[in-house]
Amino acid sequence: MKVTANGKTFNFPDGTSTEDIGAAVDEYFAGQASAAETQPAEQQEEPQQPEQSLMQRAGDLLTGGQSAGQIAEQAGRGLVNIPFDVLQGGASLINAISQGLGGPKVLDDVYRPVDRPTDPYAQAGESIGGYLIPGAGVAGNMAIGSVAEAANQQGDFAGNVAKNAAVNLGAQGLLSGAAKLVGRGITAARGEIAPEARQLIDTAESMGVKPMTSDMIKPGNAFTRSLMQGGEGALLGTGGKRAEQYAIRSKLLGDYFDRVGGYNPDDIVKSMTSTVGGRKNAAGAVRDEIVNRMGSAPVGTTNSINAIDTNIARLEKLGTSADQRLLTALKNLKGELNSGNVDFDLLQQHRTAFRTNVQGDAMVFPNQAKAATNMVENAMTRDLRNAVGKSLGPQDAAKYLKSNSDFANIYNKVLNKRISNTLNKARSEYTPELINTVVFSRKPSDIKRIWSSLDNKGKDAMRAAYISKIAEKTGDSPAKFITEVNKLKAQSGGEIYNTIFSGRHMKELDALHDVLRQTARSDSANVVTQTGQALANPVRLGAAIPTLGKSLAAEAGYGLAMRVYESKPIRNMLLRLANTKPGTPAYERALNQAATAVRPLLANEATRQ
C-alpha cells in the first residue's frame, strides 16, 4: 500500500493500521528535521575578528548584550516560516493517513514564504527555541511555533520565546490529534453536530455549565485518559476550568434541592385524608339523595329477619359459652324489625346501630361476632336495595349500593387495607416512621395507589420526600447524586420513578441528571484550589531556573494544548467531524476549520494567561 505525504512516497504492507501509518510518517519527518539540525551550517566568510559560537549568540540574546536588539530582529526574521512548517507537518500527516485509508488528499501543501534561513543570528533564534523546548529535538520545526513576534513584544524576549514556543508546541500536538481522528474513521451523513449532542450542550449551557471536549468525546483508552488528566494538572492547563465546572455543578444541585423544598410527612397524610375524605363525602351525598327520595316508604325486612334467626339459633346451641352481648343485640334488633312501620331511613339507622352495639368498647372485633354481624348487615343491605329497586328503579338501586359501599370502605378501596391501617395509626400517633413505610414502599402498586389519592400539594410533598432522601445521602456531591438517581430509576423497573416524576418534573430531573453525568469528569479531576495553584506556580518557576525554562515551557505548551482542545470551538469542530462522512466537501471544510482554528486559539489562551 502506497502513501504519499509532503512529496514523499511510503510503502506499507497491506492491512497496516492507520495508527501505525501515522506513527511511521511522524517519525520519518521528525528524523529528517533532527538530521537537518545536526548538519553543519554553511561556511560563512571568515570575519576579521573571531566569530561567536551559536550558543554564545544565544547567551547574548538571553542576557541582553549590546547586540541583543539586532540579534532579536534577525532571529525573528529567520523564524517567520515556523508556523507554516507546523501547518505543513500537520497537513502532511493528515493527508498520509487519509490516503492510506483509500481517501482523497484532504489538505493542500502549505505555502512557505521564506527559504530556510542561513543567517547565524537567525539560527541562534532557532537554537533558543529548541533550547527552551526539549521536545524540539524530536519534532523539529513542527514542534516549535512562530516566535518571530517575540522581537516586537513587550517584556523579556526569552520569556516571550518560551511562551510562543509553548503555543506552537500545543498547535503541533493538536494537529497530530486531528490527523489520528481522521485515521480512526468517522461515520455519519452531515457536516453538523449530532442533534442529541447539540441538545445536551444547549441544556448544559442554559444551566451555566460549559461541557468540555473530553466531556462530549470520552477518552477511549488509558493513554488518552492520562493525557486528559495531565492537562488538568499542568501549568496553564485545564485544572482551573474543571474546578469552575465543579463549583457550578454543585451550585446547580443545591439550587435544585432548595427549589423542591423540604419533606413534611404530615403533608402527605393530610392530602390523602382530604382527597379520600372528599370521595367519602361524595359517596355519602349520593346515598343521602336516594334516602331523601325514598322518604318514609315501608321496607320489607324478610332477608334481615332470616339472617337474625339463623345466628340466634347458632348461639343458643352454645348455651353458656355463647357471646351474650351478640345474642342480646340480635334479639333486640329482631324485636325492633317485627314491631312494624319500618321505613327506609329507619332500617339504615338500625343497621349502623347494630354494629356499634355488638363491638362496644372492644378495640378488636371478635371473629365470631364479626361473622354474625357481617351476615346480618348484608341481609339488611339487600332489603334496602330491593326497596330502592321497587320504588326508583334498578339504576338507582345499583347507585345506592355503590355509594353505600364507598362510604363505609373508601380508605380500604382507595389505598388497600394495609396502607389504610398504617396511615390511620400514623395519623393518631403522629409517627413519621410509619408514614415513611408507606411513602417509600418498594411496591409500585402501593405507590400508584397513594399517588392517585393525593392532591397537587400532596404530590409535591411525595416528590420532596424522595429528593430529600437523595439529598441526605449525597450532600453537595454531584457524583453521589448521579448514583442515587440511577438507583431510583432502576428500582422496580423504573415504575416508581415514572410515577412520582412524571411530566415536567421528570424532564427537569432528567435534564439535571444528564448534564451532571456528562460532565462527571470534574468530580474526579486532578484539580487544585486557587490557593494551591497559586503556591504551585512559584515552585514550578523556581524549579525551572536551573534548566533555563525547559520543563516550564514544555509543561506550558502541553497545558495550553489541552486547554484549547477542551475549548468550545474545538469541541464543536470535533463533534461536527464526528458527524460527517469522510471524503465529502462538508468533511473537508470541517477539517480545515479545525486545523486553521488551532493557532489563534492557542495564542489567545497564552495572552489571557
Curated annotation (Swiss-Prot):
Keyword presence, Transmembrane helix: no
Keywords carried by this UniProt record: Late protein, Viral genome ejection through host cell envelope, Viral penetration into host cytoplasm, Viral short tail ejection system, Virion, Virus entry into host cell
Heme among keywords: no
Subcellular location: Virion
One BP term from GO: symbiont genome ejection through host cell envelope, short tail mechanism
Principal cellular location given in the protein's record: virion
Region (Disordered): 32-52
GO cellular component: virion component
Job of this protein: Inner capsid protein that plays a role in viral DNA ejection into the host cell.
Protein name per the record: Internal virion protein gp16
Organism: Salmonella phage P22
